């Protein structure tokens, strides 16, 4: 299976299986708009599409390349004509992301396999950070999402980190980012103890449309 190290991609799936129908439907919802910032697109529509999809590993495994030496890999599925990034992330056992923002974009995440823990934080107090004073981040939610569950995230809700709580098995998730701001302009990582941030370029893709880079 591709999310195991050094494995080969399986043959192209039937174009109209349920997963690729989901990809098509997401593009239809985004339509002529510039992404979920547009008034004519409701994030709930994307959430509903993802909730309605029943994960079938044979449909998406060709995109799910993993590397146990990394916390996670980013595997591009679709770019939505420049309006979004649709990615499959493969989370190594017991590892996770740093605390980060979403570069004024929207993120909808569905767990395809395993489970993922989301820890949500409030924003640091900007006046303290600007003065060089610590502003520790406060946890506002800590939740584990199981296979099939969907969640939504944006900067209006705060900051978060995602981790795979399973010490032995990979976890797989589908993420829609729209507009694809982080891919173009980068995003910020935050220190939990001080609240200080640093801007970074988006992590490189591990694979693109089923082909390992």
From Swiss-Prot:
One of its GO terms (molecular function) is cysteine dioxygenase activity. The thioether cross-link between Cys-107 and Tyr-177 plays a structural role through stabilizing the Fe(2+) ion, and prevents the production of highly damaging free hydroxyl radicals by holding the oxygen radical via hydroxyl hydrogen. It comes from the Eukaryota. Its EC number is 1.13.11.20. Fe cation binds at residues 100, 102, 160. The gene is CDO1. This is Cysteine dioxygenase. The lineage of its organism: Eukaryota, Fungi, Dikarya, Ascomycota, Pezizomycotina. It catalyses: L-cysteine + O2 = 3-sulfino-L-alanine + H(+).
């Amino acid at each position: 299976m591709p999310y195991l190290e050094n494995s080969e991609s399986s043959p192209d799936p039937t174009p109209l299986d349920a997963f690729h129908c989901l990809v098509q439907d997401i593009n239809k919802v985004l339509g002529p708009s510039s992404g979920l910032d547009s008034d004519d697109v409701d994030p709930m529509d994307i959430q509903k599409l993802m909730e309605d999809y029943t994960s079938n590993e044979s449909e998406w495994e060709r995109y799910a390349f993993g590397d146990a030496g990394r916390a996670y890999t980013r595997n591009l599925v679709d770019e939505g004509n420049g309006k979004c990034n649709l990615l499959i992330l493969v989370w190594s056992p017991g590892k996770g992301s740093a605390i980060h923002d979403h570069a004024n974009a929207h993120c909808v995440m569905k767990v395809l396999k395993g489970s993922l823990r989301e820890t949500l934080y409030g924003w640091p107090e900007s006046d303290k950070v600007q003065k060089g004073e610590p502003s520790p981040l406060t946890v506002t939610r800590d939740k584990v999402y199981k296979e099939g569950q969907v969640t939504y995230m944006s900067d209006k809700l705060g900051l978060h980190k995602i981790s795979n709580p399973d010490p032995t098995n990979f976890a797989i998730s589908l993420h829609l980012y729209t507009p694809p701001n982080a891919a173009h302009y980068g995003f910020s990582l935050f220190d939990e103890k001080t609240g200080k941030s640093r801007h970074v370029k988006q992590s490189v893709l591990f694979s693109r449309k089923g082909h390992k880079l």
